[in-house]
Amino acid sequence: MRSCTVSTMPRMICRNADLEFDWLQPCFYPDEDDFYFSGPNSTPPGEDIWKKFELLPTPPLSPSCAFLELSTEPSDWASEMMLTEADLWGNPDEEDVFGPGGLGSLTPNPVILRDCMWSGFSAREKLERAMSEKMQHGHEPAATGPATQVPGAGAASTAGRGHSGTAGAALPAELAHPAAECVDPAVVFLLPVSKRNPVPVRVAPARAPARAPAVGAAVARAAAPASAAVAAPPGLSSRPPNGGDHKVLSTSGEDALSDEVDEEEDEEEEIDVVTVEKSCKTGGTTFTLTVSPKNTALGLRREQSRELILQRSVPIYQQHNYAAPSPYVENEDAPPQKKIKREVSPHPLKSVIHPKGKSFSPRKSDSEDSVRRRNHNILERQRRNDLRSSFTTLRDHVPELVKNEKAAKVVILKKACEYVHYLQAKEHQLLMEKEKLQARQQQLLKIIELAWTF
């Protein structure tokens, strides 16, 4: 909770020097603490950047590098990251804010020149990076003392809304002194370290100690909404300065999002095959599968295991051994069936006594099969005899094959067909002659009748 009520109106600024730039926070961050860490579907800070600026006017153009040559006195992080109220809201009465007097406090490599939208990706990320670098660089003087406030803070902010010359002179006087008392970043930034590579940023060296506790309090309030939603990691270390170049690990919500995704994947239903029982039987194999779902949302179904019994027939492949005896006849002394057929007498009334042998079927069924087979053979023989006699009779009626006793059946059929066609033609011819003769007979009968009348 903020100690000072801050208004979002352009002209309303808190008179406290520690909270002078607190009114800039609603421009970039919502009041909700869990905006970026509300859930796995929340968008990163860089994707909804245009939604943050839809209520703000068009930002002023970045100043040219020509004004940097006139800078004689370097400024600290506040002049690089923040603008005055008149610059932010575009006061038409102060169009010369970016004059030599207003930009005299910028460093040779300000952050605002590298990002014309002030914080194109994330304003808080750059603010935290700049503050951590300032604090790490401030460990070299290592001067500790009580917190002091500059009495001209309110006057400087009030003068910034007046004339441009006064604003350009008062703002560097207030913010030109870097931090004298440094704060450990592990205490201020209670956020998990991101997996992204750090970005090197050059920061101007500190010259005069001042306002360390005030700066630390402002940064702590800026990082408070995010640290309330995410727990602090057990170990958070910062890298020492190396040749004036400082690398700071930026914080983000990637770790929190990945943890939530892993928890959702663990909650999904998993089906494990608990037991697989394979029992080999004669001509078949039985597989027993026990399926147990793992999900707390299923309730009573989780305790009840489902057993699926899949039973399928496995064919038995055996290689035929031609030298082995027949599996259907156990008695080796029993003669094959061909010998039985040969022993059948051509006479239909003669009975044949089959040799006694062991078989899988009963004796009654064997006798019935033999009787049926014998009757079938007799009927087949009679049919063949009748067919042979029919061909012989047909051959005798064909004049060309009367004397040919060895004529084939095909020849007999062919010659018989030709002879039938010949007989049909002859019959038709005889019928025509008969009709002519009948007509001639009628004429002769009429002549006889006329002769008898005269």
Swiss-Prot record:
Residues 256-270 have a biased composition (Acidic residues). Gene3D superfamilies: Helix-loop-helix DNA-binding domain. Residues 371-423 form the bHLH domain. It comes from the Eukaryota. Keywords: DNA-binding, Nucleus, Proto-oncogene. The keyword Lipid biosynthesis does not apply. It holds the Pfam family Myc_N. GO terms for molecular function: DNA binding; DNA-binding transcription factor activity; protein dimerization activity. InterPro entries: bHLH_dom, HLH_DNA-bd_sf, Myc_transcription_factors, Tscrpt_reg_Myc, Tscrpt_reg_Myc_N. Residues 363-374 have a biased composition (Basic and acidic residues). The keyword Iron-sulfur does not apply. GO terms for cellular component: nucleus. It is found in: Nucleus. Residues 423-444 are annotated as: Leucine-zipper. Signal peptide: none annotated. Residues 133-166, 231-270, 326-374 are annotated as: Disordered. Efficient DNA binding requires dimerization with another bHLH protein. This is N-myc 2 proto-oncogene protein. It comes from Otospermophilus beecheyi (California ground squirrel).
